[in-house]
Amino acid sequence: MTTTEVRALTYAQAVNESFHQEFERDPNVILMGEDVAGGAGRDDFEDAWGGVFKLTRGLIGKFGPERVRDTPISENGFIGAAVGSAAAGLRPIADLMFVGFIGVCGDQIFNNMAKMHYMFGGKVKLPLTIITSTGAGVGSAAQHSETLYSIFVHFPGLKCVAPSNPYNAKGLHAAAIRDDDPVIVFNHKLLMGGVGTGPHVPQESYEVEIGK
């Protein structure tokens, strides 16, 4: 008889494990964002952060700076780069640190990312995942505390998910990365630090179907 190992992981650990497994599974998966590589490629800082919420810890050391890239503080710029790289055949993850910054990227998200599939008659895939933090409650100030997913669910061409526990977080991030349409994943700040009360997290890779 075979058994499946399950562990009680934090939400952030579950997301991080999903990223490592998706990077191993598909060489076209890349990541870009602010501080995701630990500090602009400085050797003594690599992996020190793994992003503000430690979701990307260990990726640059394992997969290198060609696939894990720190970006300037220019959200519209790196979201545009992610849109272009997805249209060109890569499978990017764009880490938008706080959802309050997403308005800066409105043109790229609403006029390019959401519409590209339709503008080309379904012939162009756009496998792009935006991950962002959402929610108040940690004293993060006005521009870091919004909950905006109710806006984005009304735009055709976008899929939006908001995981509620580590099990769903791991499976939904995997599903988002493998999806051929753009997905925005809203990770609540109050969930990312604690062990969830939901199902324990299997060690192997798995998907939680989006929309179910």
Please name every model-derived segment.
Residues 1-191, 203:
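Thiamine diphosphate
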Residues 193-212:
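Glycine/aspartate-rich loop-and-adjacent alpha/beta segment that forms the canonical ThDP
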